[in-house]
Amino acid sequence: MGIIYCEKDRTFTLQTKETTYQMQVDQYGFLLHLYYGKKAEGCMDYLLTYYDRGFSGNPYDAGTDRTYSMDSLPQELSCYGNGDFRSASLMLENGDGSMSCDMRYKNYTIRDGKYSLPGLPAVYADNDEAQTLEIVLEDPATGVEAMLLYGVLPELDIITRSVYIRNQSSEKIYVNKVMSAELDFLYGDYYLLTFYGRHAMERNLQRVPVAHGSQMIGSVRGTSSHQYNPMMILAEKDTTEDHGGCYAMSFVYSGNFQGEVLKDQYNQTRMLLGVQEECFRYPLEAGETFYAPEVILSYTDQGMNRLSQNLHSCIRHHICRGKYRTEVRPVLVNSWEAAYFDFTGETLYNLAKEARSLGIDMLVLDDGWFGKRDDDNSGLGDWYVNEKKLGETLGGLVKRVNDLGVKFGIWIEPEMISEDSDLYREHPDWALTIPGRKPVRSRNQLVLDFSRKEVVDGIFGQISAVLDNANIEYVKWDMNRSLMDVFSVMTKEQGRVMYDYVLGLYDFLDRMVNRYPDLLIEGCSGGGGRFDAGMLYYTPQIWCSDNSDAIDRLRIQYGTSFGYPVSAMGAHVSAVPNHQTGRITPLHTRGVVAMSGTFGYELDLLKLTEEEKDEVRSQIGEFRKYAPLIQNGRYYRLTDPFKSEVCAWEIVGNSQEEVLLNVVMEEIHGNMTVNYVQLRGLDESALYKEQTTGRIYSGAALMHGGMPLPAEFGEYRAYQYHFVRE
């Protein structure tokens, strides 16, 4: 299907619908990377050149041949200590203390279906949708093996990579660095696209030329972080949204990560993505195996929009799982900005009644329903219902709300513990703290040691008792601080704790998914601080940002869209003046922006005017009409909100049968000029009727002539145009 081994050339070729990836086992057993790009045929080893380079070491096997050096050859798994002085994929500390490895080809296996990773999220596929290539490399001196895993999904133009490290030696070793994916390019004038940010302003696009030296992103916070998203794009110099070559790497992992792009002395480029090497030293006893997380790769020569669509399809259909993989999500209202910690069962019931009258599907009770939790200084870890505060049982409240025809959800933060809590008084050792040091607090809370099974078991027992005794249909899983004081009392090997913590998190989430298959879980870490493909394996949507300001959200959701589908972006209409920025935007505009996400409300419904309530009912009706298209259609960025006074995007049906064009005017001026937006992805030969005016346009006209936008008075106006093919 998609993987071919040629014995004559000793090449492995991975073919997708539009791309080719090729590597070769050379005469010394090194696995060299030959090519990744637009589909091509034949052996590509002619691209390799060999010259005598000063100060470049030569493998002993090469004898007197000074033209052969790992320092200039493209590789699939570069190793520290074998003559390659660039940043390496693999760094091992051997039993004798030496820091070197020299991986040579041993064998391979090709099989139908997609590999999985024990304890880790990974792309999944049916046997007829994917193939797996396993290549085993071995260090002849130690017997340590590296198994390289390649998953090929031909129809999606997706290739996945991962690696196992198996200690087949007789001594304990340490994995000090392991990158899950490496791409080496022999030439090219590239730009690096990364997505930086901060709390409440995540995933801002940065595009910089790849210069000599290393450019690095990463996180040491224990999460993928608000500061850098674990995704990188390498683009040819002139690549645009619609034209040009570009490569993506997206990490299917939610903890510390490291992404690096470097240009070497010979103008070659290396791209690496994997677990953060800082504070990482993973022990492997004889016979043990370390499993590295997965990286999703994609390439296209058709610009950034197509690259994003490849990733969107992969995440929607081969990362997200369960009932809500394809099902439209409920429209919900979250109690946080309506009540914060100040509520009773009766106030929540009244909010649910108002929600029902407006057509909202679900009420979500946010922070404050458990333990002694009237502010953010106490109660975390005590996951029992505060019935005194509610004035009734949670099960009773949920039943009353359900009787209105409204579903019910709750907020949880299972990874955290307050020092003022029953759990901390009983199990202070469950918190991540360093003996002899006072802990670093953040939001007045500490982090539980999820690297320990008994801690995960204890918290899961509490949470499941709540879920078992009330009809909870949604959970918002929050995580409101970074990891510090990382020390586990259960091991002397502290270099493994950060990684094992994430495995504990995944174990907890996997138990929830299996025990409650119809439960919708929304991920959150102070908004978008853990927005990655790893979390999406368990939570099909993630709260995009704690910043719900509609204009800031244009930029946040724009950056997020490069790697993640609209169906994954938690987005709500919130009150004005906005609680994060103080900005006032029209209710209609807030609705249009939130519809390019999971859509819901984050405000006090009881304070809305009758006119606003009518607008909310209208928004919900429009969303229900567009929801299948929004959730499953092809997303196109039409403008850059950082550079244009207009932010425009569209979603096109997979059969080009309909399109929803969305526009927000970011700036207004006196004597306004008219802006035009050119649509993308339509059938040029087809006719499309705009559903509000009834006017008919050709697909070619909309794509090449464009659509004139109103030049109206008023700040931050928004427009939606729904076109249906005749």
Model-inferred region functions:
Residues 18, 163, 287, 333, ...:
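Conserved, mostly hydrophobic/aromatic
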